[in-house]
Design a protein with these regions (language model features):
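Helix-rich interaction surfaces within compact, conserved domain-sized segments
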Residues: 57-76
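Low-complexity, compositionally biased segments
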Residues: 12, 20, 42, 63-65
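A short interface-forming secondary-structure element
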Residues: 5, 47-61
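Low-complexity, Ser/Thr/Pro/Gly- and acidic-rich intrinsically disordered stalk/linker segments
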Residues: 39-43, 70, 80
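Short edge beta-strands and adjacent turn/loop segments
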Residues: 25-49
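Acidic-enriched, low-complexity/disordered segments with a strong bias for Aspartate over Glutamate
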Residues: 39, 55, 60-62, 81-82
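Short, charged, intrinsically disordered terminal tails
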Residues: 2-5, 73-82
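N-terminal acidic leader/helix
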Residues: 3-32
Length: 82
């Protein structure tokens, strides 16, 4: 398993928003922040709890959130205390 890079909540939120808006149909969607999953010891230790849809369709955003979490979760972990 490849090691992930630690990011602050602000950094990870920025990365997730950029990736989310790059997905088809999600140009106006955004997240407020990511949430730490405290009992997770390996792999992705964060989740996207809420998304502001903007003009995006929920079906497009659902697909995009799953894709973004999967892709960025392999690269980054959320640092515990900001």
């Amino acid at each position: 398993m490849m090691a992930t890079v630690g990011r602050s909540n602000a950094e990870l939120t920025e990365l997730v928003n950029a990736a989310l808006r790059g997905q088809p149909g999600c140009e106006t969607a955004r997240i407020i922040g990511v949430r730490l999953m405290p009992d997770v010891r390996s792999g992705r230790n964060w989740e996207i709890p809420n998304v502001v849809l903007g003009d995006s369709l929920i079906s497009d955003v659902d697909r995009a959130v799953i894709s973004v979490q999967h892709r960025l979760g392999r690269k980054f972990h959320l640092l515990g205390d900001d």
